[in-house]
Design a protein with these regions (language model features):
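Donor-sugar nucleotide-binding helix/loop cap in glycosyltransferases
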Residues: 3, 8-226
Length: 226
């Protein structure tokens, strides 16, 4: 089957694969999932931008969609490693503990819980994890993600952000004009905006790098507070 931009935005194959992975694991095909990601990342980023800009509406975003992370690695490859082979799902605290991987740490239980929450929710924004009844699992893409080449990983993150309710607005704006990121974060207090700016910029950088790779012109992103 040949997958299209529309297929990616529909999430149909991903949803079906997640269902198989969770309920009929023996039927899950890593090769089929890898082929899907390779196909959708072979499509030009400009095609995804055009599709995103053509959408009649984009779902509203909330404060929960504005990323807060501590470690980009722990949200991506580290998360895939921590949750790999876990069939029963993990809580925020269990995720944080596995991400520390037996290292000594001084975090309080509350801090551990918050760390796990922030990293796994960011991983979910990037399509790598999913939540069922307050427990977290690797998605079908998360299962195979470490097997992919670095350039495919970066391209996947870039297009994933283009279907996110928060980032799609920011990225499409960057394609048209200089964009001030705090203007999209006004549902947060200014203090919280400043705390989350770095996290958001780390994810946006995937898109910037991909546009540079494909010679797509975009405008700068700024972080000015009025």
């Amino acid at each position: 089957m040949k997958y299209t931009v529309e297929d990616f935005y529909s999430k149909k194959f991903e949803d079906e694969s997640n269902e198989i992975l969770l309920n009929e694991r023996w039927l899950f095909s890593e090769k089929a999932m890898e082929d899907y990601v390779i196909q959708i990342t072979n499509i030009s980023i400009s095609d995804y931008i055009s599709y995103c800009e053509s959408l009649p509406s984009i779902p509203n975003y909330t404060s929960k969609d504005i990323t807060q992370l501590s470690s980009l690695y722990d949200c991506t490859l580290g998360m895939c490693k921590a949750l790999k082979g876990v069939d029963h799902g993990l809580s925020y605290t269990e995720i944080a503990t596995k991400l520390h991987d037996g290292q000594s740490y001084t975090n309080t239980p509350g801090a551990l819980t918050k760390y796990g929450e922030n990293q796994v929710k960011t991983a979910s924004q990037l399509g790598l994890t999913l939540c069922i009844k307050d427990l977290w699992y690797l998605s079908a893409i998360g299962q195979i993600f470490p097997n992919l080449a670095d350039d495919i990983q970066n391209k996947y993150f870039s297009i994933c952000l283009l279907r996110d309710p928060f980032y799609s607005r920011v990225l499409c704006s960057m394609c048209k004009q200089e964009t001030n990121l705090p203007n999209y974060m006004t549902i947060l207090s200014e203090t919280t905006q400043k705390r989350r700016l770095s996290s958001c910029k780390q994810l946006i950088n995937f898109f910037i790098q991909q546009c540079n790779t494909e010679s797509i012109s975009i405008y700068p992103i700024t972080t000015n507070f009025n």
